Amino acid sequence: LQCYSCINQVDCTSVINCTXNQDACLY
């Protein structure tokens, strides 16, 4: 699993608890 900032949601397969600048994208 790798975490990316909310700004990079495009590269995420699924988004979980994406708030502010916290890393939330997991795949």
From Swiss-Prot:
Query: Found in which tissues?
Result: Expressed in erythrocytes and lymphocytes. Not detected in platelets.
- Its main subcellular localisation, reduced to a broad class, is membrane
Q: Which residue spans traverse the membrane? A: none
Q: How does it assemble?
A: Interacts with T-cell surface antigen CD2.
Q: What highest taxon heads this organism's lineage? A: Eukaryota
Task: Give the membrane topology, semicolon-separated if more than one.
Answer: Lipid-anchor; GPI-anchor
| Protein name as it appears in the record | CD59 glycoprotein
Key word Cell membrane present: yes
Glycosylated residues are N17
Keywords recorded for this protein, A-Z: Cell membrane, Disulfide bond, Glycoprotein, GPI-anchor, Lipoprotein, Membrane, Secreted
Question: Its biological function?
Answer: Potent inhibitor of the complement membrane attack complex (MAC) action, which protects self-cells from damage during complement activation. Acts by binding to the beta-haipins of C8 (C8A and C8B) components of the assembling MAC, forming an intermolecular beta-sheet that prevents incorporation of the multiple copies of C9 required for complete formation of the osmolytic pore.
Its localization reads: Cell membrane; Secreted
Give the intrachain disulfide bonds.
Answer: C3-C25, C6-C12
- Give the record's PTM text: N- and O-glycosylated.
